[in-house]
């Protein structure tokens, strides 16, 4: 039996509000990080993430000059076009940010649906690798029920 049939470990957010709070903190961690933030700004890869189980959409892009490295809107009412579109559950996002979900495998197994310039998204993945440790520390400290 292949591991495609094996259930993924899950840890659920207590509410939609908690999910958004954790994701806002996660994007802030990326934006404020002295290594990740400038590299993500320079990569200039606008992305749209849809989280199906919490019925939320966030669009992320490089920040304006002189401002934060990243900007995001919890809406599709934006004045930029995403290069990459990803659809996943909040549980998949939580596993990914803990370093427990490989995006390429998740796409192949349909846990993540990807559209647009997927190569651009995969190209910035190495930039965000340091986030995993920061995210795990935040989860362990403030949201231990989300550890997987």
Describe every region a protein language model picked out.
Residues 2-148:
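Feature captures hydrophobic
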